[in-house]
UniProtKB/Swiss-Prot annotation:
SUPFAM superfamilies referenced in this protein's UniProt entry, alphabetically: P-loop containing nucleoside triphosphate hydrolases
Gene coding for it: RAB11B
GO terms for MF: GTP binding; GTPase activity
Residue sites binding GTP per the record: 21-28, 69-73, 127-130
The protein, known as: Ras-related protein Rab11B
Amino acid sequence: MAGGYRAEDDYDYLFKLVLIGDSGVGKSNLLSRFSRNEFNLESKSTIGVEFATRSIRVDDKIVKAQIWDTAGQERYRAITSAYYRGAVGALVVYDITRHVTFENVERWLKELRDHTDQNIVIMLVGNKADLRHLRAVSTEDAKAFAERENTFFMETSALESLNVENAFTEVLTEIYKVVCRKALEVGDDPAALPKGQTINVGKDDVSAVKKVGCCSS
């Protein structure tokens, strides 16, 4: 890594992301592909909640993503509030081969927006893009929906590692930009923030500026 070795817990920002969408759309495999570069064909539905972390570089800052994954099945919806709390980014995932999972995106978006800050960065993700011959949701329909809902959009394949890195990286980069804009809007000099100051993008301080400096370019 440029600039020398940095310890795992050495980061400038910590951003909480959530993965949502129907059960079986590939949320857990997207998470394992991004965080560990692994894919498990035998993966079962996630029971309860799990999360993984990974740090990336944005500009000259280290951004650590804490990515939460839960089953999309209705019986787990009691964990909703705690799951969303503090999230500043979300990947709303559907399966391009199952149209019903795309139809349900609207409900997932409503639930997400009911529980998070208005500035949350959202990426609509059409997963399983490797199954082109089974496609049930057109790229054009999904793009049009994303534009109407003011979200980003990308098609991915956790199996082939297609666009997985790009989807997470784009969300994290956009969150970073939002944090920087908010610091600038209130008249702060982002480079002069007191050490350890938190900038709230969401409803609590899960996503925080850990050290001095923001967007100094």
